[in-house]
Amino acid sequence: MIVLGIDPGLANTGWGVIETRGSVARARAYGCIHTEADEPLHERLGQICAQIEQAISRYEPGSVAIED
């Protein structure tokens, strides 16, 4: 199973992809989406959305977990 984890934030959104096979889990990719405070809100949200969509398209997770 492939899981995309997201730690949401407007200035910095962290993400990571793990893959599990049986009892073995490994990190496949991770990163941080940084947006600038002086950019309009809609542009910042658009950047976050676009990069999360890229991760979903590339890694095709079966589940997504979002930190509360």
Predicted segment positions?
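Phosphate- and other anionic-substrate recognition elements at nucleic-acid/protein interfaces
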Residues: 1-68
